[in-house]
């Protein structure tokens, strides 16, 4: 049996230099996430949560430390290899859906498949199946402007999962939604986790929603803490 973590983060540090000012955003962050695990990171704005997700997704490089995905160091990968990793192994969900406004829902969801080399027919078939999985098969041919906020975020989730990634990185995925839609989105993530075995690493301000996940940690002043402080996490 393979006990290797899906993703391992070792002593990750990130510093930014602006003129004479050195800002340390992440300080010796170490943790692992396993296959099919759902983990929440809570923390106040500016605590380093989004920076951490960018490093984990290979969108930025650390000042020191390393990120290993399935035992392979992102630090040692070429930019092309990291792009391939993002296309095939990682999914991304953001607070704002970032859907392409001139394309309908099924075309938006199919985009990662087309980028990955699938033909249009295969991509559209898989995209429609994914929209059905998030309950939007009847809205497949609507553009983002014709969808509600909750529906747009469901399309974004379908797009993130269409390549069947091992891990989805979600940055405030319910931040722009009302409580009812936020609750529905988190329920959907849990259902997809059970059905597909996808691991989720979710950044959120909502402690109640974070409590639904397997594990909760807090980003505080650049450090990752296992103990949550309610005032610091809201």
Curated annotation (Swiss-Prot):
This is Lipoprotein-releasing system ATP-binding protein LolD. Residues 7-234 form the ABC transporter domain. InterPro entries: AAA+_ATPase, ABC_transporter-like_ATP-bd, ABC_transporter-like_CS, ABC_transpr_LolD-like, LolD_lipo_ATP-bd, MacB-like_ATP-bd, P-loop_NTPase. Its main location: membrane. Part of the ABC transporter complex LolCDE involved in the translocation of mature outer membrane-directed lipoproteins, from the inner membrane to the periplasmic chaperone, LolA. Responsible for the formation of the LolA-lipoprotein complex in an ATP-dependent manner. ATP binds at residues 43-50. One of its GO terms (biological process) is lipoprotein localization to outer membrane. Disulfide bonds: none annotated. The keyword Iron-sulfur does not apply. Its EC number is 7.6.2.-. GO terms for molecular function: ATP binding; ATP hydrolysis activity; transmembrane transporter activity. It is a peripheral membrane protein. It is an enzyme of class 7 (translocase). Belongs to the ABC transporter superfamily. Lipoprotein translocase (TC 3.A.1.125) family. Keywords: ATP-binding, Cell inner membrane, Cell membrane, Membrane, Nucleotide-binding, Translocase, Transport. Signal peptide: none annotated. One of its GO terms (cellular component) is plasma membrane. The keyword Magnesium does not apply. It comes from the Bacteria. NCBIfam families: LolD_lipo_ex, PRK11629.1.
